[in-house]
From Swiss-Prot:
It is a peripheral membrane protein. PROSITE patterns: COMPLEX1_30K. The keyword Thylakoid applies. Signal peptide: none annotated. NDH shuttles electrons from NAD(P)H:plastoquinone, via FMN and iron-sulfur (Fe-S) centers, to quinones in the photosynthetic chain and possibly in a chloroplast respiratory chain. The immediate electron acceptor for the enzyme in this species is believed to be plastoquinone. Couples the redox reaction to proton translocation, and thus conserves the redox energy in a proton gradient. Keywords: Chloroplast, Membrane, NAD, NADP, Plastid, Plastoquinone, Quinone, Thylakoid, Translocase, Transport. It is found in: Plastid, Chloroplast thylakoid membrane. This is NAD(P)H-quinone oxidoreductase subunit J, chloroplastic. Its EC number is 7.1.1.-. The keyword Ion transport does not apply. InterPro entries: NADH_DH_suC, NADH_quin_OxRdtase_su_C/D-like, NADH_UbQ_OxRdtase_30kDa_su, NADH_UbQ_OxRdtase_CS.
Length: 158
């Protein structure tokens, strides 16, 4: 089943894949990493001016990594804002996705957290570095194949 936004993207020749609807009726679309930045700009111009959240997850051990964006279209006088969920999948060996920081500035810390926990590199992000783990941390703690170290020494702050 194709939703309103998916039909609009098809009409304008923008490549994507419809993943259906979630339990709240929000349309979910898959966008290829190479197309994501240009489609993000188009969605912003189309009215999806609010990035509600961004997160990432490990799809399966040894499989793809996913970056998920929840966008909202807020219009004056509209009874209900339109929402869409965008999923961008990246290969585990070199997970690179274009950053949308220059489209939605609120994604700054969220993309940094996804980088820190899963190792997804967001190209053209102005400050892509660890945000939760120490800079010296090795590995990506939320990957399903991550092996936690037996010991990690926290240095004294003095």
């Amino acid at each position: 089943m194709q939703g309103h936004l998916s039909a609009w993207l098809v009409k304008h020749g923008l490549i994507h894949r419809s993943l259906g609807f979630d339990y709240q009726g929000i349309e979910t679309l898959q966008i290829k990493p190479g197309d994501w930045h240009s489609i993000a700009v188009i969605l912003y111009v189309y009215g999806y001016n609010y990035l509600r959240s961004q997160c990432a997850y490990d799809v399966a051990p040894g499989g793809l990594l996913a970056s998920v964006y929840h966008l909202t279209r807020i219009e004056y006088g509209a009874d209900q804002p339109e929402e869409v969920c965008i999923k961008v999948f990246a290969p585990r060996r070199d997970p690179r996705i274009p950053s949308v920081f220059w489209v939605w500035k609120s994604v700054d810390f969220q993309e940094r957290e996804s980088y820190d926990m899963l190792g997804i590199s967001y190209d053209n992000h102005p400050r892509l570095k660890r945000i939760l783990m120490p800079e010296s941390w090795i590995g990506w703690p939320l990957r399903k194949d991550y092996i936690a170290p037996n010991f990690y020494e926290i240095q004294d702050a003095h």
